[in-house]
Amino acid sequence: MLWAIVLLGYLLFVVEWFVIDRIAGKPAGILDSNTKVLPNYDGWVNSFFANSAGSIAGSATNWSITLLRAVGSVLCGIVVLKFGYRYAVMIMMGLMCLCFPFLIIGDPLGGNNQLTLLRPLSKEVMGKLSSLSSQLHEGQLLGPVMAEGKTMLADGQTIDLVQGLDKNLIGTSSSIAGYALFIIFRSTIAIGGTTLVTYSQPLIASLSTQRRKSVLSNANLWGFNSGIVVAFVPFLFQSVQQAGTKYWVFILTALILIGFGILCVFAWFEKQMDPFMPQKQTKEQMQLGNQPSAGDILKRKATWKMIGMYGICLVVLVNPLTGGWWNILQAVSPASSFNVKDGVKTLKPLEGAGGYFAGLPTLAILWVLGYGMGYMVFSPFNKTVYDRKRWLSFMFFMNALMVIVIVLFAATLGVGTAVGFAFVAIATFIGGSFAWSMQSTILILPHEFKEYKRSEVSVLFGYIWGFGYVIYTAFDITNSMFLEAPKLANPGMKGVSILPGAIAGVALFAGLLLAAIAIVVTLPSSYLKNGDELVSEMTKKWKLNQWQFLVASKEKNRYADLLK
């Protein structure tokens, strides 16, 4: 029951994390006397930005959150030792609820929020927008206005707009400060939510059998994957996208209240934890060394090998869910596969929904649903007595291969054609099956290494997730710099191709996956364990043609000896 509640809290975090981006809306733009169509001011981005801040600044949202997820994950192990398991979970769930000020910061509040760009239209400024006169009325919320050589807010206040890296005028110093505060409070969702999946591991470690540990470790992944599906499926439809951006404050308020409800349910049902669960440390216990030392765990070589391997695993899991990956696929696609209007690419087979709305969510959903196939075909390996190194080497290689296959389909057929998008979608689904099932194998390893006791698992997973997200953040920063470099080299020019940066990003992506194999071969051996007692080492070597574990059963099956 407690495991399900903790996993539900993690699922809610994933939904919040991705839904916020889906209902962001568009920058406010700058109105002038020639503007004939009034912009749509739904969503929260227009509160802070007049124009796009570019790939690097735009990705800063993701960087800051993944870095703070790293901080939260590292701290979670320390928190559970300091306060005990029950209060650690409640603290982190409470932290998710403390994000609510970002709702106030991002809402124009009827034009009274000095941290946003939207203001009530004054009669004087309305007279300067003659081409929009039939669409305007006094007091209407509008974004910045350019008139008579001056930039002003809709209430007539003269302002200076800050230039972005690509020379666009992006916002005022106040709105950019507001955006920084928005990100800081939003990040509490990430800090608290990330730790919940870490806190599910002590519950798994307390189970009596390796098989049950394997089942729940695999099931843990459905928390993230289900959250992705819930966050992306509604936005396949443009009507939902429009409604979501219009009512973004109400949607996010509801999600925060649901999170508070989950916190209350956990506090109500929580009972005395199993003695094996991490408990609060007293000074005497620290001195006697009865409880694990977070510092000692971090010093172990196996910990850093797990961090490096899992960091690269996070790259392959998260990158295909980002706009940066979608931009790469569009950049390598033939120009003939798109309709281009006013410099905006639209997928031909999905014009009704628009390239961004339908393309990225569709591939993201297929990517996470790929785990369904992986769960049946690849994850059963976790129940075997095979040594893990060859298997993980094979999985990292296959992930690198699928990245290359997806890019080749996009480059030759184009994601803007029905056939090309279909092939990319199929390859994405297959690639997801390899990636997510590989993660399930990685997450079972700490339960099989002799280096770690059950009481140390929560601390170890905190380090794995924490420093792993540092690795992912470094990749995300580098990738966004690759994509932005062609534009920075040609400031002020429109329609600059990001193809060179896209190629560099793909090379980095696939190269990291192949480099992970060098870490895998140095991993410690896995053991069958009874609690913290070592039963036997898993020495049986897996070969490429050995897939009998798919049909192995403990009940009178000739392959039963393959199972734990």
From Swiss-Prot:
This is Major facilitator superfamily transporter MPN_076. It comes from Mycoplasma pneumoniae (strain ATCC 29342 / M129 / Subtype 1). Belongs to the major facilitator superfamily. It comes from the Bacteria. It is found in: Cell membrane. InterPro entries: MFS_Mycoplasma (IPR011699), MFS_trans_sf (IPR036259). Its main location: membrane. One of its GO terms (cellular component) is plasma membrane. It is a multi-pass membrane protein. The chain crosses the membrane at residues 1-21, 65-85, 89-109, 176-196, 220-240, 249-269, 306-326, 358-378, 404-424, 425-445, 457-477, 501-521. Keywords: Cell membrane, Membrane, Transmembrane, Transmembrane helix, Transport.
